Amino acid sequence: MLASLIIYRVNYLSNMLLCWRVRRSSMKNGSYFRSQFAGPRLCAGVLIVLALFGASGCSRFVKRDVAVPSLLSPLVEADTNQLLEEVNRLAQVRSLRGKIDVQFLDNSFAKCGIAERYRTAEGDVILERPGHVYLVIQAPFVGTKIAEMASDGERFQVAVYQGDEKYRRFVRGTNSANYKRLEGSAALDADCDENGKKKTAMAQQRQVGALSGLRPQHFTDALLVPAVAASNANLIYAKSEAFVEELDERPRAKRGARVVRGFYVLDELQSEGEARARLLRRLWFDRFGGIRLARLQNFDERGQLITDVVYRNSQKFGEEGNYTLPASIELTRPQDRYSLRVTYQMPGEVRVDRDWPPETFTLENKTSLQEVDLDKE
């Protein structure tokens, strides 16, 4: 504003000087009486134009209030060792058993610009390190079994009880093996007809198909955070920071308000010699008011994202509340094109660090479902 006014004043004085020179020149040329009216008219016109220009120029510098996302603060500082300690704090939990809500999100139609969210189901989960899991998923209210899955850390079994015949089966496999997606799982090639909308009748089949593609070890690694081995000479940790704009979900936030959240990003790299390294994991730590593991990403040998886990809503777990853990976990498998959201119903009632017999994590085909052994396919 001040700069615009200065420019305006300078132009005004310059043109006054110009008008004076015009009149003086006219007097010298003997045309004073012809110019005594033309000169002032010229000067007045120039000054009016300058006044309008100055006014419009000033308007461009008028202060306006613009809403911008505010940074969530305070931001807590931490070094790499403190970030590793936060991960290993979560990794101290040996076992969990609790009631959960499970919701699937089928991303098969992502190329159509949509994703289908299935109805929430109820579940009971038992998790134990290393890699032990038993999960039963039931329909709400009626308690009908939709699926069961188990793993003893080396082999897994998945039983699907609902849906069409091609979905109902008993699947066996090895945790460390990579398998092709089974026929009948959520579709790989989406049909984008009808503006990308699928028929409602397909919803249950899609849900069961997503269950068929779920592997117990993916579930275990998401809910029981693996520890980090800071003493491993082959691992390199690189810390950086990131700022992400998001919807303000605080209780008193205005509708539609947005904020900026600060993160530390810790890359876990494996040295491969000759000045090369492979990215194994990327860990995101929320810095607002404390240090909290907020996201965990895993990558394969080609650098492709294979697992993306988001952690929210930290709560006290167990009767004694000795552990503060995320009560909401969202697991995304981009290559398998599905997401799974798990929410603990009552974190305070979750059994923590109990010992479970080995048979807990083995599933038998008691209902004579069609068996599929992935190691023999």
Question: Which role does the model predict for each range below?
Answer:
Residues 2, 10-22, 26-58:
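Sec-dependent bacterial lipoprotein signal peptides
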Residues 58-59, 212, 228-230, 235-367, ...:
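Gly/Pro-enriched, hydrophobic low-complexity segments
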Residues 101-107, 140-142, 154, 158-164, ...:
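Hydrophobic lipid-interacting interfaces of membrane-associated proteins
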Residues 88-96, 116-118, 126-131, 142, ...:
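Edge/loop elements at the starts and ends of beta-strands within beta-rich repeat scaffolds
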Residues 94-102, 121-125, 129-135, 147-149, ...:
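One face of beta-strands
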Residues 58-119, 203-213, 375-377:
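N-terminal leader/targeting segments and the immediate start of mature chains
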Residues 130-218:
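An acidic-aromatic
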Residues 56, 64, 108-149:
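Long, hydrophobic/aromatic-enriched structural stretches that serve as scaffold segments
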